[in-house]
């Protein structure tokens, strides 16, 4: 069950694409090749994102049609010239369709390789991203596709689109009587709707409503496994998971249905190991355990026809091909092989039919298709000047700093870089304490801090990244000396998982990528919250607390792209500081080089956000008008202030250029 997309010989289209990507950039310059390795684009980009000969990010929504690609930096600038506001989501629906085709193809290969007789369906759980562009792009792809709902609202959306798929509907989550009736209505209309029993209290309502509607229910059972994945999302699986029935409850459900004469309604077995499974071994272990449930249920006379392995198919946000929380150590082929072979082996061993396999692979379908693009509105850089000696009567701590600086430049000195750094840190600490007590002036503090920065810069130049003993010092200095970039976006609205669970997303400039990334930066959002900062960045095969950056003009910094934000982020985003949804555009790229762009979301206005918190914009305008009229300002100025207030109410919630 080896995966030809993993880290062996480059025999697969995926890995050949990675090598081709590296070679193309290497032809332009060695610097670009180094940059490509620094940001790991060749791996997390998955052939959808690359760097062109100009050092710009390019997008190829369908790697099977490599000539259909667009320069993202040029596209954003062209859109800005036409009035596009930033931040904005640039969405590529064609990537969604390619992801769906790729997953279906992987399972087709796995089934053919094993000789597996059952079907396969990818069922898209719309909770991952319920936006219309996502659902409609997938159902119009021409590929087999089912839909999954986890709430009444989601089920209504699924039922409304079900006529376009004529496939499978899976109903998960907590269910009240109305939810259950909706699902049964869908079954009555001719759809194949599986009501998955996750709590024993649900089955009585299902049987009651099925009788009232005169419909035979199509049921599933979610089994709670002992197997569990690891990482940030592990609590959604295992024995302590929020959903599912324990072994004794599964037996109780079987007997309840047998007594009601509805045992034949139980047709689907469902389990869920967790989201973003990093280690293929955890997936294989869980599928083998769940296959035992399939065997045992058949022994009890339950004719299970569908085997729903739930979610778990991860994506490599880091590009490290590892077991870390935001990466995966497997590819699509290996994932499909492990599932098909584990289920197939259990069936062959016990002489059972091969069931239809279902996966609920939402993240793997949607993550790549969306890029958040924003502008940098301010930069704070540490600049280095030639230090000057302190006054002869300067306090001892200032003299110590200066003496350390001089010693650093003497040839043949035997003190270590670490010792210089520690001495300067202690002296600076004494100066900060002394400043608080009045022993040092503001000018003396500023002089000491500037000299300390110069010393850090000098130490940094002499450190070797290949020396493991130097790595902690390098990390410390990079964090201390990194540029602060203030970016026009809300982390809480656009990348809530980066804040809430410390998830890593690829972030890099859209241009200037033909240069060596010699600077370091940290990214801060525009909310009034110290948590509004990105803490971790891709740095080669590792993760760093600062972002590598090519040299740039601080007066005209590059636009930034936040990649792989297509799963969950739009839906989970919150309204901290009343920053709302960003604008969103759908981008379609064609083989002849043409590009079509459609505005799919105008973004929230200030008025929209105020209404969310029950503040009526018209009432606010009236109150403001009353205040203005009570001033002694002249009529023209009053009118100007009123117009500005009203324009602000119906303007973008993010910062806008004049």
UniProtKB/Swiss-Prot annotation:
InterPro entries: Ala_racemase/Decarboxylase_C (IPR009006), Arg_decarb_HB (IPR040634), Arg_decarbox_C (IPR041128), Arg_decrbxlase (IPR002985), De-COase2_CS (IPR022657), De-COase2_N (IPR022644), De-COase2_pyr-phos_BS (IPR022653), Orn/DAP/Arg_de-COase (IPR000183). It is an enzyme of class 4 (lyase). Substrate binds at residues 307-317. It catalyses: L-arginine + H(+) = agmatine + CO2. Its cofactor is Mg(2+); pyridoxal 5'-phosphate. One of its GO terms (biological process) is putrescine biosynthetic process from arginine. Its EC number is 4.1.1.19. It comes from the Bacteria. SUPFAM superfamilies: Alanine racemase C-terminal domain-like (SSF50621), PLP-binding barrel (SSF51419). Disulfide bonds: none annotated. Signal peptide: none annotated. PROSITE patterns: ODR_DC_2_1 (PS00878), ODR_DC_2_2 (PS00879). Keywords: Decarboxylase, Lyase, Magnesium, Metal-binding, Polyamine biosynthesis, Putrescine biosynthesis, Pyridoxal phosphate, Spermidine biosynthesis. GO terms for molecular function: arginine decarboxylase activity; metal ion binding. The modification N6-(pyridoxal phosphate)lysine is found at residue 127. Pathway: Amine and polyamine biosynthesis; agmatine biosynthesis; agmatine from L-arginine: step 1/1. Belongs to the Orn/Lys/Arg decarboxylase class-II family. SpeA subfamily. Catalyzes the biosynthesis of agmatine from arginine. NCBIfam families: PRK05354.1, speA. This is Biosynthetic arginine decarboxylase. It comes from Salmonella typhimurium (strain LT2 / SGSC1412 / ATCC 700720).
């Amino acid at each position: 069950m080896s995966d030809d997309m993993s880290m062996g010989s480059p025999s697969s289209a995926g890995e050949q694409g990675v090598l081709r990507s590296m070679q193309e950039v290497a032809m332009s310059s060695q610097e670009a090749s180094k940059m490509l390795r620094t940001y790991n684009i060749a791996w997390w980009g998955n052939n959808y994102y690359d760097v062109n000969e100009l050092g710009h990010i390019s997008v190829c929504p369908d790697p099977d049609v490599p000539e259909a690609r667009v320069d993202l930096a040029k596209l954003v600038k062209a859109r800005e010239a036409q009035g596009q506001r930033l931040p904005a989501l640039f969405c590529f629906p064609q990537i969604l369709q390619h992801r769906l085709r790729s997953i279906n193809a992987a399972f087709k290969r796995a089934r053919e390789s094993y000789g597996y007789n059952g079907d396969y369906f990818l069922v898209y759980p719309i909770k991952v991203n319920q936006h219309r562009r996502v659902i409609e792009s997938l159902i119009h792809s021409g590929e087999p596709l089912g839909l999954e709902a986890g709430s009444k609202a989601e089920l209504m959306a699924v039922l409304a689109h079900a006529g376009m798929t004529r496939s499978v509907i899976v109903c998960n989550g907590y269910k009240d009587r109305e939810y259950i009736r909706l699902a049964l209505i869908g079954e009555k209309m001719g759809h194949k709707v599986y009501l998955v029993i996750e709590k024993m209290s649900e089955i009585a309502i299902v049987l009651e409503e099925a009788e009232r509607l005169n419909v035979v229910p199509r049921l599933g059972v979610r089994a709670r496994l002992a197997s569990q994945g690891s990482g940030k999302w592990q609590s959604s699986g295992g024995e302590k998971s929020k959903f599912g029935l324990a072994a004794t409850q599964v037996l109780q459900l079987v007997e309840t249905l047998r007594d009601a004469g509805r045992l034949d309604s139980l047709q689907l077995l469902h389990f869920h190991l967790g989201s973003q499974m990093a280690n293929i071994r955890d997936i294989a272990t869980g599928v083998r355990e769940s296959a035992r449930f399939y065997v045992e249920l058949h022994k009890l006379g339950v004719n299970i026809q569908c085997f729903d392995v739930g979610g778990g198919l991860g994506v490599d946000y880091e590009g490290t091909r590892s077991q870390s929380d935001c990466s995966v150590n497997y590819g699509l082929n290996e994932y499909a092989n492990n599932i098909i072979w584990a289920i197939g082996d259990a069936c062959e061993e016990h002489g059972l039919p091969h069931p239809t396999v279902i996966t609920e692979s939402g993240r793997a379908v949607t993550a790549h298709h969306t890029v958040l693009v924003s502008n940098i509105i301010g930069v704070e850089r540490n600049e280095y000047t030639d230090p000057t000696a302190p006054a002869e009567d300067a306090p001892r701590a200032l003299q110590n700093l200066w003496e350390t600086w001089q010693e650093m430049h003497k040839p043949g000195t035997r003190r270590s870089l670490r010792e210089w750094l520690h001495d300067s840190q202690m002296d600076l600490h004494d100066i900060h304490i002394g400043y608080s007590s009045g022993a040092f002036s503001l000018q003396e503090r500023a002089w000491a801090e500037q000299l300390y920065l110069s010393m850090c810069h000098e130490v940094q130049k002499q450190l070797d990244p290949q020396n493991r003993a130097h790595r902690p010092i390098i990390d410390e200095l990079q964090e201390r000396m990194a540029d602060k970039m203030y970016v026009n976006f809300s982390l809480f609205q656009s990348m809530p998982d980066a804040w809430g669970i410390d998830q890593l997303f690829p972030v890099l400039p859209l241009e200037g990528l033909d240069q060596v990334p010699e600077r370091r930066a940290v990214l801060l959002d525009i909310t009034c919250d110290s948590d509004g900062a990105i803490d971790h960045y891709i740095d080669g095969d590792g993760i760093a607390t600062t972002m590598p950056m090519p040299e740039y003009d601080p007066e005209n910094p590059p636009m930034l792209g936040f990649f792989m934000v297509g799963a969950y982020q739009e839906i989970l985003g919150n309204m901290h500081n009343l920053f709302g949804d960003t604008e969103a555009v759908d981008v379609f790229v064609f083989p002849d080089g043409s590009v079509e762009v459609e505005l799919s979301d105008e973004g929230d206005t200030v008025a929209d956000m105020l209404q969310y918190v029950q503040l009526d914009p018209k009432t606010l305008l009236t109150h403001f008008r009353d205040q203005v009229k009570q001033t002694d300002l002249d009529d023209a100025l009053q009118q100007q202030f009123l117009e500005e207030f009203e324009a602000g109410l119906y303007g973008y919630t993010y910062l806008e250029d004049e």
